[in-house]
Amino acid sequence: MTTITPEAARLRLAQYLSPAFPTGGFAWSQGLEWAMDQGAVTRATLPQWLEDWLDHGAGWCDAVLLSLALRRGADHAELDDLARAMCPCARRLAETVEQGTAFAANVAALTGRPQSAAALPVAVGRACGCLPLPAGEIIGLYLQAQAAALISAAVRFLPLGPVEGQAMLAGLQPALLAAAARAGTADPKDLASATWGADLAAMRHETMVTRIFRS
């Protein structure tokens, strides 16, 4: 087995979680588009939406699932079933499964090691479990990539400039690190979501007549 140094592993991780890695993440918004369209999320309230996503919503659930998938001996098939069951509606299920499937296919093509389709956090955990990096570091960068994708969706929809969006991401970074640290020691019973507004937004997005994003 080829050994990879921590320095090379960080580059590999940054590549996997880059928006340039072809998973189609730019096409999804986790229901944020509907909330913005209805005026429930504005440039003033977006930071709170992101904090709730991270502490009580899909961000936290993804962090726990990723943490579990990174561990030696993890049952990735069981975790994939759990990740799918946690999705509140059809488009959120499609969002994580389609991105995870693309991620797995790309990693398999790059590494020559087969990767079966899975929900995104499980696919990432399975691919990155062999990297000689702390779990908190992997989870933190994953969460930042997901938060950046949501902010990018807001930049494309709201009157929100890209620099202001980057400032929001920078302001969220202490919370990202804290969530990653908590998730690093989490177990399945810590999986929970209480962002009903975001879940309802994702459901209502499915019936929008005109939309930019797929969720």
Curated annotation (Swiss-Prot):
SUBUNIT field: UreD, UreF and UreG form a complex that acts as a GTP-hydrolysis-dependent molecular chaperone, activating the urease apoprotein by helping to assemble the nickel containing metallocenter of UreC. The UreE protein probably delivers the nickel.
Annotated localization: Cytoplasm
Q: Domain of life of the organism in this record?
A: Bacteria
Any idea what this protein is called? Urease accessory protein UreF
Alphabetical keyword list:
Chaperone, Cytoplasm, Nickel insertion
A GO molecular-function term, please?
nickel cation binding
UniProt xrefs under Pfam families: UreF
Where is this protein chiefly located?
cytoplasm
> InterPro entries per the record?
UreF, UreF_sf
- Which family is this sequence assigned to? Belongs to the UreF family.
